[in-house]
UniProtKB/Swiss-Prot annotation:
Pathway(s) of this molecule: Protein biosynthesis; polypeptide chain elongation
Source organism of this protein record: Helicobacter hepaticus (strain ATCC 51449 / 3B1)
Listed Gene3D superfamilies: 2.30.30.30, Nucleic acid-binding proteins (2.40.50.140)
Location relative to the cell: Cytoplasm
Gene Ontology CC terms, in alphabetical order: cytoplasm
Single GO MF annotation: translation elongation factor activity
Role played: Involved in peptide bond synthesis. Stimulates efficient translation and peptide-bond synthesis on native or reconstituted 70S ribosomes in vitro. Probably functions indirectly by altering the affinity of the ribosome for aminoacyl-tRNA, thus increasing their reactivity as acceptors for peptidyl transferase.
UniProt name for this protein: Elongation factor P
Origin superkingdom: Bacteria
Length: 187
């Protein structure tokens, strides 16, 4: 199905020359002279590159053949992440490169969204908030308060986040996966 210029918006998935993209920024421009156009930044699902594209009044884009599946992370074996489809129990292996930066938030049993383009896995999305255990951080000192500064903490996945001084090794915390920021202790 063709997508017209007036339908473009942030987050929309489009296909140009057989490559699926997501619109990350969108600006409708109406110059004093001439026809209006849309300037957009689009990110490729295949290689992650961001390009700027201008769409003019009669331009059309195709809707990509994308399918999203909920899959559960099983284990990591030397360069490949193993996932299982939660409905069909079919298993797939994705390389470290295919999983990308979100690997630092993935723990055993975590359900993720995997996006497929023409039956090929192209991206992995983790939940916005994950609960992880702190494996290493500096000990508390007298006078450390919850409103004080921050200290680095290594999580069970190897990711390092800044946490308040009162947070201890072995505690479970919630982390925002988009920003990598500490949110709160798990109660």
């Amino acid at each position: 199905m063709a997508i017209g210029m007036s339908e473009l918006k942030k987050g929309l998935k489009i296909e140009i020359d057989g490559i699926p993209y997501r619109i990350t920024e969108y600006q409708h421009v109406k110059p004093g002279k001439g026809a209006a156009f849309v300037r957009a930044k689009i990110k490729s699902f295949l290689d992650g590159k961001v390009i700027e594209k201008t769409f003019h009044a009669g331009d059309k884009c195709e809707e990509p053949n994308l399918q999203e599946k909920t899959m559960q992370f099983l284990y990591h074996d030397g360069g490949a992440f193993q996932f299982m489809d939660t409905t069909t129990y079919e298993q797939i292996a994705l390389s470290d490169d295919q999983v990308g930066d979100v690997a630092k938030w993935i723990i055993d049993g975590l359900n993720v969204q995997i996006l497929f383009h023409n039956e090929k896995a192209i991206s992995v999305d983790v939940p916005l908030v994950v609960e992880l255990t702190i494996t290493e951080t500096a000990p508390n000192f007298k006078g450390d308060t919850s409103s004080g500064g921050k200290k680095p903490a290594t999580l069970e996945t190897g990711a390092v986040v800044q946490v308040p001084f009162h947070v201890l090794e072995g505690e479970k915390i919630k982390v925002n996966t988009e920003t990598g920021e500490y949110l709160e202790k798990v109660k």
